[in-house]
Amino acid sequence: MKISFHGQSCIKIITGDTTILVDPFISGNEKCDLKAEEQMPDFIVLSHGHDDHVGDTVEIAKNSGATVICNADLASFLAVEDGLENMAPMHIGGKRQFSFGQVKLTQAFHGSQTVRDGRIVNLGFPTGIVFTIEDKNIYFAGDTGLFSDMKLIGELNPLDVAFLPIGDNFTMGPEDAAIAARFLQAKLVVPMHYNTFPLIAQDPHKFVASLDEGITGKVLEIGESIEI
């Protein structure tokens, strides 16, 4: 399985002949190396409804026929307002089997809304995501602050990789993310959600260097991938 990082919180997972795109914020994101019109994933997974995470989901899903996996409130909105047909609604605590493996949604401490036609629309609870693919567990924290039940996520799902936001201001910063890494005890920690905008400017290498002894961190450059 190959996992690549494409700026902000966008990652791509390729397992066998299946491609999964997570939080595809592409258009308007100078830090992303992808082009929305070229993406043909089989699945799109969304952590929450903010524009810098839903991103180009509607265009990509309509072009590719991808199934969109997300919380049920966001799924309903995308179906009714944007005409998406292949939706897989879930909610926090639930898990579901797909052709590529299992998805389980966890809590995240953040918001989830958009502005449509001048009105603010609440899009349900934000989530983290635990993928179980090829007998590997990948935790994608989404946008969140630090919370102590991250210990439980790590205990219930021994993690091979954890993607953690470090940008501060809108999510936990590097200091809290280092504590999150301690709680989760993943084999590998990858920072995300930083340097897209001035408000979330961070040094990811400094974050990796701050991790507790025994915790391995890796900064993925834009377009870089790991294989697990």
Curated annotation (Swiss-Prot):
Protein name: UPF0173 metal-dependent hydrolase LMHCC_0991
MF terms in GO: hydrolase activity
Pfam family membership, one: Lactamase_B_2
UniProtKB keywords: Hydrolase
Species name: Listeria monocytogenes serotype 4a (strain HCC23)
Family: Belongs to the UPF0173 family.
Superkingdom classification of source: Bacteria
Keyword Glycoprotein: no
The UniProt record lists the keyword Transcription regulation: no
